[in-house]
Amino acid sequence: MSRDDQLFTLWGKLNDRQKDNFLKWMKAFDVEKTYQKTSGDIFNDDFFDIFGDRLITHHFSSTQALTKTLFEHAFNDSLNESGVISSLAESRTNPGHDITIDSIKVALKTEAAKNISKSYIHVSKWMELGKGEWILELLLERFLEHLENYERIFTLRYFKISEYKFSYQLVEIPKSLLLEAKNAKLEIMSGSKQSPKPGYGYVLDENENKKFSLYFDGGAERKLQIKHLNLEHCIVHGVWDFILPPP
């Protein structure tokens, strides 16, 4: 039975409500959209089409950005469907890589804040810092050890431009850039009322300009954030732009 025959047969089995939902879902693929491959060595043209279709399928039933877990699965499925060998890490609480692509361990991040910057990346939770000693030098060492668990890092950034217009951006954060944190200038925020007191690790270029900051958050989660990471130091692999029709 051909694909068209299968669709016709299935259509006849749906009730009116299911047919209405099916039509809405099909119309999702007819939205105004642009998929741009801008750089990179892993992804082929098929991946950008497949992943873009998965993004629009998600937004057929949700007004929220793709969560990290949904990103991981959509990313992995799109890679495999496009002919790239990929598999998710077996443990979802793995303190390192999230996915393996052609035998390369990769960490995945997402960013979807309402006030997201076009020029600077912010990762609100890079890793948990645990309940050990709160000494910035030791925390920095833990971050550098964490980097040993993966070779590449990709973050999916979501921009809501208007009620019906949104965009996704796939960016690679070079591991070599993050490794520059070994020379970070550490500063404890002594005036903070938080306990333990938070601190910063500033990564500067040769002209003392800030490349990015490590923020050791001493709050309830005790986590490491990456702040003010200039997009100019990263690789934008692709952009997906969508304009949805009004309901």
Curated annotation (Swiss-Prot):
Entry's EC annotation: 3.1.21.4
Reactions the enzyme catalyzes: Endonucleolytic cleavage of DNA to give specific double-stranded fragments with terminal 5'-phosphates
Name of the featured protein: Type II restriction enzyme SmaI
One BP annotation, GO: DNA restriction-modification system
Uppermost EC category: hydrolase
Gene Ontology MF annotations: type II site-specific deoxyribonuclease activity
Superkingdom: Bacteria
Keywords (A to Z) from UniProt: Endonuclease, Hydrolase, Magnesium, Nuclease, Restriction system
Cofactor(s) required, per the database record: Mg(2+); K(+)
InterPro entries assigned: SmaI
Entry keyword Magnesium: yes
